[in-house]
Amino acid sequence: MGAQRTAAAPAAMSIPIAKSFYDLSATSLQGERVDFNVFRGSTVRDYTQLNQLQARYPRRLVVLGFPCNQFGFQENSTNEEILSILKHVRPGGGFEPNFTLFQKCQVNGADTHPVFAYLKLHLPAPADEAVTLMSEPRFLAWSPIRRSDISWNFEKFLVGPEGEPFRRYSPRTAPAQLEPDVQRLLKLAK
């Protein structure tokens, strides 16, 4: 006879979950509160590929970036320093994002930003890598840990023109690889 294990029931999340992506908001790096309802009708490798994707569809695609310091503490700068670091260090070379960057936020754990609570509820795992949570447990710097947690920087979510979460992509998927799905969603938009 083996010992039986009982799993503790997951704690109820105290984060209010929005009914629609367009009910959400966040604060930009410039300190302005952005109501996501302004993106209604639009479809949302990194920084340079995100710029390229945004440039290809300037009127109908909206790229939103949310810096986070939960993955190996790689974003340890302040909100005020982020744009300067992007311009001069990473990726550098005078880089300026042509998409909206929001203030740093938590994407996992008890203080998960409502945007990510909503997205993870509707898309609990990346479509291209549904079984991996994280390859380096020593970098788990949040609690509670959930199966739907974002695994690393540059995990991406594509939201349709009516605000419905469409697909979630692992960090291994380059933004350029999202283009067929972006085109598919743009065809649905009227």
Residue spans for each PLM region:
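N-terminal "domain-start" segment that seeds a small globular fold
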Residues: R5-N37, A125-P126
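Alpha-helical solenoid scaffolds in eukaryotic macromolecular assemblies
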Residues: A26, G31, F36, G41, ...
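Conserved helix-turn-beta segment immediately C-terminal to the redox Cys motif
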Residues: R40-F66, K87-G92
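A short acidic/small-residue loop/turn micro-motif
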Residues: G41, P171-P175, P180, L186
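Extracytoplasmic/secreted proteins, especially bacterial periplasmic and envelope-associated proteins
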Residues: Q49-Q52, S77, E81, A110-P114, ...
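Thiol-based oxidoreductase modules, predominantly thioredoxin-like and allied folds used
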Residues: P58-N79, G94-G109
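Thiol/selenol-based redox catalytic cores and closely related redox-interacting motifs
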Residues: H88-T173
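Short, hydrophobic alpha-helical segments
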Residues: L123, L185-K190
